[in-house]
Amino acid sequence: MEAIPVLAGPTGSGKTFLALRLGEEVPVEVVSADATMVYRGLDIGTDKPTPEERARVPHHLVDVLEPHEAMSVARFLALAEEAIAHVLSRGKLPLVVGGTGYYIRALSEGLHDLPPPDPGVQEALWAELEARGLEALLAELARASPEDARRVGKNPRRLVRALEVLRRTGTPPARFPKRPPRFRYKKLVLWPDRAWLFPRLEERAKAQFARGLVEEVRGLLERYPRMPTALQAIGYKEVAGHLLGAYGLEEALERDIRAVKAYAKRQYTWFRHEPGDVVYLPRGGEEAYVGFRDWLRLHFGL
């Protein structure tokens, strides 16, 4: 089977823009690999394509869950592979687009076949995380499996899941057998200079506040006062803290900007070690379109 194209890169590098522009020229359908765009109602803070844009260029795995529903890597993998197969069955080309590196890695490299989650153990671990802190629990995981510790990084949800598996089974996740990937992939990773990206991240955050992010989060908190995982996303968490009285609006914006820059740094680190058939394009946004099209012509005849 021919490979599936993947467009990856740090947040704000222009992935959605490039995919939408490509869709004006080529009959592609986007399969989103974004951990927050799956949620309905999280629109402004995720820079989600509008309904009009998605009507022009079909998107899969966007607006498929309510904010209180959990999205695991295993669930993403099942939904994404199903969407890719569906697009291929209709003679169209799926284009995987996103910056959630662990999702993309699971697609291209396979996923460890772990036991189903145990909500009771996870709840206890969340309480322990609150009491002991992330570093203490991460050190526990690192003693058992440095590979798993590197993989979960500073992500508390992945840390809780890894420790849950370890404590229940005595075996760290990395030692479980892997399910092989269903498709082959070729990846293009946008790699703009940080001096180009970071000012754009600041301007995007300010624009999101101006477009009504605070009102969007207020509405979500009214529906979900217990702050589900979806509302821990960058931007939403910082605005929620403001709305719950922890700090002012200006500080919420400053926290948002710091958080999104830190996330972009982690994405650079992650994608720097991306395995498989990978090309890095040292551009972002509109400047990257020519290189993106050249890559598609070379490898996919588009």
Swiss-Prot record:
Q: Source gene?
A: miaA
Q: Subunit info? A: Monomer.
Is Nucleotide-binding a UniProt keyword of this protein?
yes
Q: Where does the chain bind substrate? A: 11-16
Q: Which GO terms describe its molecular function?
A: ATP binding; tRNA dimethylallyltransferase activity
> What name is this protein filed under?
tRNA dimethylallyltransferase
Q: What is its EC number?
A: 2.5.1.75
Q: Which NCBIfam families match?
A: miaA
Q: Which reactions appear under catalytic activity for this entry?
A: adenosine(37) in tRNA + dimethylallyl diphosphate = N(6)-dimethylallyladenosine(37) in tRNA + diphosphate
Keywords, comma-separated and alphabetical: ATP-binding, Magnesium, Nucleotide-binding, Transferase, tRNA processing
Summarize where ATP binds, as residue positions. Answer: 9-16
From which lineage does this chain's organism come?
A: Bacteria, Thermotogati, Deinococcota, Deinococci, Thermales
The record's top EC class is transferase
Q: Name the species this protein comes from.
A: Thermus thermophilus (strain ATCC BAA-163 / DSM 7039 / HB27)
Q: Biological process (GO) annotations?
A: tRNA modification
* Cross-referenced HAMAP family: IPP_trans (MF_00185)
